[in-house]
Regions:
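Beta-strand-rich domains and repeat architectures in extracellular enzymes and scaffolds
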Residues: 6-51, 66-78
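Repeat-blade elements of multi-bladed beta-propeller folds
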Residues: 74-82, 128, 273
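A flexible loop/linker signature enriched in serine peptidases of the S9 family
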Residues: 40-48, 65-71, 85-94, 108-113, ...
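Short coil/turn segments that connect the beta-strands within blades of beta-propeller domains
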Residues: 32-34, 81-82, 121-123, 166-168, ...
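Short loop/turn segments that connect beta-strands within beta-propeller blades
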Residues: 52-55, 97-101, 141-145, 193-195, ...
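A short beta-strand motif characteristic of beta-propeller blades
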Residues: 10-18, 57-67, 102-107, 147-152, ...
């Protein structure tokens, strides 16, 4: 038997095999729940793949590489109303119909973009923008007819913008130097108005949660618009919190020694989401060094494991 030092035995895999491997990055449903879109890394390229219900999967395009580059990346694309909105490697935002046709740029080529988030009516897109060390939340119309505008400025970093279902409010996460997003962040909420050119503009900005020693993450409005759910470690672990938007009352939904939201190394992370009727929250949390899926009945507070989704890490 041949003996070789550790790490020097022959391998059937060459470096080229690893570089050419397909990597699964993220996925999203279209608004109708019948078309699934996901992002594959194929060598140096990021390719969006689309699969309508009952049909074979197909590449949306192979000429543009999908890759967001704000911070450590992530938040590469979104899907809504029959269209995919994605960040191309150059930093431009594109819109492409899921049915057919080419992709069309909707922002000019400057800076970097991430986390494109379509408005409920499909007319506007809020996204994280970074240019020459200056970060902001920007807004542009989804047809690309107007020059994009800065919507939110003042903080050093931004992530996870979220529209209220009525389109009249926006929530997001922000933080400043020297904090990292796993040290201390702020959950912000603002009313939206319309500017003269029709783009949304900000008013009545409020800090809802978080500080330099508390991490809040992943704001998510309920489909009926009554509640805002987010993760916060204000009691030691990253638990789920629910805010009643009418009364302002906030309560912890999962006060236990399990973490729901992990460190936000990248944009676009998701660990929980609502059911369509707003009555149930589905989430993934760490238990015994594993990530496990659960459902939470918001009326009874009952938490139930989802055994069929064992091993899933994001929702």
């Amino acid at each position: 038997m041949e003996v070789r030092p550790f790490g020097l035995w022959p391998s059937p895999l060459a470096p080229g095999d690893l570089a050419a491997a397909t990597r699964f990055r993220d996925l999203a449903w279209d608004s109708d729940g019948r078309t699934l879109v996901w992002l594959e890394g194929r060598g140096p390229q990021g390719i969006l793949v689309c699969q309508p219900h009952g049909e074979a999967p197909r590449d949306l395009n192979t000429t543009l590489s999908v890759r967001a580059q704000v911070g450590y990346g992530g938040g590469d694309f979104a899907v809504a109303r029959g269209h995919a909105y994605f960040v191309e490697y150059s930093g431009r935002l594109y819109r492409q119909a899921l049915a057919s046709g080419p992709a069309h740029p909707i922002t000019p080529e400057f800076g970097s973009a991430a986390s494109p988030t379509p408005s409920p009516d499909g007319r506007h897109l809020v996204y994280v923008h970074s240019d020459e060390g200056r970060d902001s939340l920007a807004v542009v119309d989804t047809e690309g007819h107007h020059w994009p505008q800065r919507l939110v400025t003042g903080a050093d970093f931004y992530m996870q913008p979220a529209w209220h279902p009525k389109g009249d409010r926006l929530a997001w996460i922000e933080w400043d130097h020297p904090q990292m997003p796993w040290d201390g962040t702020r959950l912000m909420l603002a009313q939206l108005a319309r500017s003269r050119d029709g783009l949304p503009c900000l008013r009545n900005k409020t800090t809802l949660a978080g500080d330099i020693d508390t991490v809040v993450a992943q704001p998510h409005f309920s489909p009926n618009g009554r509640h805002l759910v987010y993760a916060s470690d204000q009691r030691g672990h990253s638990n789920l919190w629910l805010r009643d938007l009418a009364s302002g009352e906030t309560r912890c939904l999962s006060e236990d020694a399990h973490d729901v939201a992990g460190p936000a190394w990248i944009q676009g992370l998701r660990a929980f989401s609502f059911s369509a009727d707003s009555h149930t929250l589905y989430f993934i949390r760490g238990e015994n060094s594993q990530r496990r899926a659960h459902s939470l009945n918001l009326q009874t507070g009952t938490i139930t494991p989802i055994l069929a989704l064992a091993g899933y890490s994001h929702i």
